[in-house]
Amino acid sequence: MVTGPYSPGSPPRCGRTHRPVWCMLSIFLCSLTLSAFGVERQPAHAASLTELPVPAVVSKVRPSVVTVLTRGIPQGGSQHGAPSGSGSGIILDTNGYILTNNHLVQGVTSVVVGLSTGRLTPGRVVARDFLLDLALIRITAPDLVPAEFSQRTTLEIGETVIAIGNPLALKGGSTVTVGVISALDRSVLTPEGETLYDLLQTDAAINPGNSGGPLVDRFGQVVGINVAIAPSAQAISYAIAIEAMTSPIASMMARG
């Protein structure tokens, strides 16, 4: 959680705790689908899917959730005692692509990815989308378990969602919280004065280190990437909606 004063409606990010930087760049939205790069997109119609109990959803998704450990350069410029941060990410495919938030890896000097098996492996940032606060990390590791990404075009206010991530980089595996989709198409102002659009609002508890982790539905499919919380309220968290990410992820994978 980013500390400091915030104006109303300006949520802090819920991941890396040191000097997040947001930039506004124009991006090229690739028309390619995620499936062209091997990312698991699933049927669009909920009627063709089977709702799972929450424990089954967790068992399905947890192997695809990673911890993102970073080391950055302090403001003084010296690398001695460089602050470390942590967040979460989600495995996109067996080729080692990991999706996370850009503010977790902005300005860092090294990235290490912790898998659900407990294995730590070096990662490198291969692409970024500054507008959506997304970044793509690549690792080399065997037996990766990609997450399934929902292809549903409509989410319903009130439907159950589950946030999975690694708050505080706690040992023993990822943390799970459950809530509902509270609202759709939210726009929020970042502490740096930029605006994120088309966000999902949820009351699933999001904590420091959850940034970059998935928000999933009762089918065990990713419907969003956790990105921010409202500092002046309780139980208001935000996630980037999957429909807003489809083309940017494909574009980043093509570049990375």
Whereabouts are the PLM-identified features?
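N-terminal secretory signal peptides that target proteins for export/translocation
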Residues: 1-17
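Bacterial N-terminal signal peptides
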Residues: 23-36
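Conserved active-site neighborhood of the chymotrypsin/trypsin-like protease fold
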Residues: 45-48, 73, 93-171, 234, ...
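C-terminal cap/linker of serine protease catalytic domains
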Residues: 49-58, 165-169, 183, 218, ...
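Gly/Ser-enriched beta-turn/beta-hairpin loop segments
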Residues: 74-84, 126-132, 170-173, 184-200, ...
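Conserved hydrophobic positions within beta-strands
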Residues: 89-91, 123-125, 181, 226
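Catalytic nucleophile loop of clan PA
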Residues: 90-91, 205-225
